[in-house]
């Protein structure tokens, strides 16, 4: 019979259109976790979502003339194991760019 030690885990999912801003945010989060003696795993790259929009170029007749636009949503996953109260406080005070969407699960 094995005894499992209950580990506390924080899972952080990040989404952004700009990959560089996303990577900088991941680096800040991991650096903050390392300074507070928590174990950070990641950033784990998740699949990039591509959304393509097809738009008619002319306002009237020419349906053959179309233009395509796309948005790419880059995603990353970070797991923080054994966070202390200092870790959570430091993550709450962290200043991240406005173009990065963050989901936190305990």
UniProtKB/Swiss-Prot annotation:
It comes from the Bacteria. The keyword Ribosomal protein applies. GO terms for biological process: translation. One of its GO terms (cellular component) is ribosome. InterPro entries: Ribosomal_uS10 (IPR001848), Ribosomal_uS10_dom (IPR027486), Ribosomal_uS10_dom_sf (IPR036838). Keywords: Ribonucleoprotein, Ribosomal protein. Part of the 30S ribosomal subunit. This is Small ribosomal subunit protein uS10.
């Amino acid at each position: 019979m094995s005894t499992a030690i209950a580990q506390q885990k924080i899972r952080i999912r990040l989404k952004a259109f700009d990959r560089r801003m996303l990577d900088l945010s991941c680096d800040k989060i991991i650096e903050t976790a390392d300074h507070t003696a928590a174990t950070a795993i990641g950033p784990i790259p998740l699949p990039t979502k591509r959304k393509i929009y097809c738009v008619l170029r002319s306002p009237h007749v020419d349906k053959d003339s179309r233009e395509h636009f796309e948005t790419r949503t880059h995603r990353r996953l970070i797991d923080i194991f054994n966070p202390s109260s200092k870790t959570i406080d430091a993550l709450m005070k962290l200043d991240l760019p406005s173009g990065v969407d963050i989901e936190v699960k305990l």
